[in-house]
Amino acid sequence: MFVQILIYVYLGICAGMILFNIATALLSRRREHRSFRDGIRLELTVSQELDRLAETGTVSERHLRFMERRLRRVNGMAAFDAALECLCVRRPELTRSYLTALNGVMIALAEDYCRRDEIEAAYFPYIIRKYRLLDGQENEALKTMLLDLLHESSIYCRENAMQALYTAGDPAVLVRALRIIDASSLYYHSKLLSDGLLNYTGDTWELADALWEAFDAFQPWMQVTLLNYFRFSSGAYCEKIHALLNDPAQDDEVRFACLRYLGRYPYPPAYADLLRYATPSKNARWEYAAIASSVLASYPGAETAAVLERNLYHPNWYIRFNASKSLEQLGFGYRD
């Protein structure tokens, strides 16, 4: 009897799970249908307003108030996103003008979204980045909101905020953002920042000037981040990088990044120093010799070959491996 009761209980649990899954699937389909329907309706509404914008050159106050109410809900913002995806393809110029007219609405929404939970708060800067709402706009309110999001614990909030700031084309606000991240105790992966800076939509030379001007004020890890960005963006900074490499006051990690930069962009005045760093020394960390051995692949010559051949016999595996790889890239075979 006890076994039968257990079987019936088990069957009841299984039936309950099946019913739960069916109900969840039906609700999910209903939400998807509602979201699709809302997107179509909102696309029609915005499209009609685009017609009015084309005729009169303005967006009605009534429509702006409607959009402010509509976009306060996350599902409304999602429907707006879906509508814009279509309209940006069909009517790109008018849609850009429409988004510019919506600037006041976005400012009003910014404070509201910043107070929400991290997922909803992260969605707002995603929309700003996706449709480049800051591009060419002197919108200090939105920029300030994005800077405030950099204090959030969620990496989604911080990364989406940075991605939005990259589209602003404003070097000064990016330096402010990097200073906030640099001073924060929250972890932010260096690669996210160095790769993100490559997405900057403004004048990259102005950005580089601003970053170099603020360079000394950053902590070593952020300096390495900036050097990695420079390494992947331009070879125009070899002279500055060479000076940093030979500055004993700089952190070792910063100097390692300088070595890697000079490996990507060969700089003849640095050749003698690279040979020196590639020669292992008891007074220097082994990483100098290992990285310099890899960098010398970009500097062919008899002295390069001699240093690398000596490093093949070094007890440190990384030095031996990098020396062998560089010799191989320079055309030396095993018989050589």
Task: Show where each model-derived region lies.
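Alpha-solenoid HEAT/Armadillo repeat architecture
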Residues: F36, C114, H151, Y166, ...
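N-terminal signal-anchor transmembrane alpha helix of single-pass membrane proteins
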Residues: M1-D38
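Amphipathic alpha-helical scaffolding segments comprising HEAT/armadillo-like alpha-solenoid repeats
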Residues: H63-E68, T100-C114, G136-L149, P171-I181, ...
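Amphipathic alpha-helical repeat scaffolds
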Residues: D51, A110-C114, P125, L146-L147, ...
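Glycine- and small hydrophobic-enriched segments that form the cores of compact globular domains
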Residues: I128, R132, N139-A217, W221
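Short inter-helical turns and helix N-cap capping residues of alpha-solenoid HEAT/ARM repeat scaffolds
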Residues: R116-D117, S153-I155, S185-Y187, F218-Q219, ...
